[in-house]
């Protein structure tokens, strides 16, 4: 019997492979290689264990999940187990043949990323040519098959002025929902923070754009909005609270409380091949470490919002304050709060450096060979 309520959702990061190279990607810097990915049997077992626990939703993500040839089989297995299935995709891989297979397998929803409404801007962010036209065609194919569509628009200093256009694009493409989400600075996003950080004025303009669209569109389009943490005064309840509502499975089969949890040194993350999902969720050391409120520092213990924001993001506390067990520096009570606000304002006011694109590191031998070739 479970000792804690089961997670609502499981996120299956099937692969880190992706045609795009977005500099804000939240995948880890050390990307999993193809040879490290969990096999079909492992993912099927994961879905079975999740359903047995009482999980309701399976989100297929990556990288680009449509690069996995077994994706239709996994979606069909999720459907047979009674799990709601959602595909999170770039829309530039697999195309209509794969989409036909996914529809036949019982896929229930598609989330499609959009980098910009300007074709050149979209390609610049994605590191991929003709990305917007391919996404447009994919969105049309999704809607032609009657599948619900959500657009995920990631906002930063280079596209903030075009939020109204992104909302209009969602209507044009037949989406039922759009998530207008400012970049969250984890993984590659943290590495590229200075290149992506918007100004306070840009943030204010995006808020006005979203509020205006909500009033004018009403029920025509659902609009979610996520602010950049660095300008906030209160932390968000990251993942609905550590190890409370969501569980993340990495391409290697590691069971994680969130996608960035591996950045926290000292936590031991276990693999599905070594221990059951239920046992890890209920009794795993890493899951218990920051679950609930007992771990919180004194200033959090007395906060009336402690069971609303659950202390904020542990990975961000480590990255910005040097301690995963301290206050999320987004919180105005944190000694580090003023510093991260100043950092955001300084970076936003400075010229944007070049992007460091999300690409896997080449093996040392290959890199050395390439370096020799470059000198010949």
Swiss-Prot record:
GO terms for molecular function: 4 iron, 4 sulfur cluster binding; cyclase activity; iron ion binding; oxidoreductase activity; S-adenosyl-L-methionine binding. Transmembrane segments: none annotated. Binds 1 [4Fe-4S] cluster. The cluster is coordinated with 3 cysteines and an exchangeable S-adenosyl-L-methionine. GO terms for biological process: pyrroloquinoline quinone biosynthetic process. Its EC number is 1.21.98.4. Residues 4-219 form the Radical SAM core domain. Keywords: 4Fe-4S, Iron, Iron-sulfur, Metal-binding, Oxidoreductase, PQQ biosynthesis, S-adenosyl-L-methionine. [4Fe-4S] cluster binds at residues 18, 22, 25. SUPFAM superfamilies: Radical SAM enzymes (SSF102114). Its cofactor is [4Fe-4S] cluster. HAMAP family: PqqE (MF_00660). Belongs to the radical SAM superfamily. PqqE family. Interacts with PqqD. The interaction is necessary for activity of PqqE. This is PqqA peptide cyclase. It comes from Xanthomonas campestris pv. campestris (strain B100).
């Amino acid at each position: 019997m479970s000792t804690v309520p089961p997670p609502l959702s499981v996120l299956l990061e099937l692969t880190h492979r992706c045609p795009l190279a977005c500099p804000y990607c939240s995948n880890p810097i050390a990307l999993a290689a193809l040879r490290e990915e969990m096999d079909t049997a492992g993912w099927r077992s994961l879905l079975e264990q999740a359903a047995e626990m009482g999980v309701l939703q399976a989100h297929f993500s990556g990288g680009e999940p449509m690069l996995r040839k077994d994706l239709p089989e996994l979606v069909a297995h999720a459907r047979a187990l009674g799990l709601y299935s959602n595909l999170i995709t770039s829309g530039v891989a697999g195309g209509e043949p794969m989409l036909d297979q996914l529809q036949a397998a019982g896929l229930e929803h598609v989330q499609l990323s959009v980098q910009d409404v300007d074709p050149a801007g979209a390609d610049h962010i994605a590191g991929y040519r003709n990305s917007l036209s391919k996404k447009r065609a994919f969105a049309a194919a999704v809607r032609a098959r009657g599948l619900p569509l959500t657009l995920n628009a990631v906002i930063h200093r280079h596209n903030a002025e075009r939020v109204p256009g992104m909302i209009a694009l969602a209507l044009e493409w037949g989406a039922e929902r759009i998530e207008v989400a400012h970049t969250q600075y984890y993984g590659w996003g943290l590495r590229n923070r200075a290149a992506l950080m918007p100004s306070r004025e840009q943030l204010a303009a995006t808020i006005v754009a979203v509020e205006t669209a909500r009033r004018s569109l009403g029920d025509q389009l659902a609009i979610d909005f996520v602010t950049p943490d660095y300008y906030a005064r209160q932390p968000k309840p990251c993942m609905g609270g550590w190890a409370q509502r969501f569980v993340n499975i990495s391409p290697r089969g590691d069971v994680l409380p969130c996608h960035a949890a591996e950045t926290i040194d000292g936590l031991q993350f276990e693999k599905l091949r070594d221990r059951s999902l239920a046992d890890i969720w209920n009794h795993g050391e890493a899951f218990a470490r920051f679950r609930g409120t007992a771990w919180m520092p004194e200033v959090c213990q007395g906060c009336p919002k402690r069971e609303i924001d659950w202390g904020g993001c542990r990975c961000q506390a480590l990255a910005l304050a040097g301690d995963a067990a301290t206050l999320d520096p987004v919180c105005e009570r944190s000694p580090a709060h003023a510093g991260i606000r100043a950092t955001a304002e300084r970076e936003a006011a400075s010229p944007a450096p070049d992007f460091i694109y999300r690409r896997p590191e080449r093996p040392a031998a290959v890199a050395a060979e390439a370096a020799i070739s470059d000198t010949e």
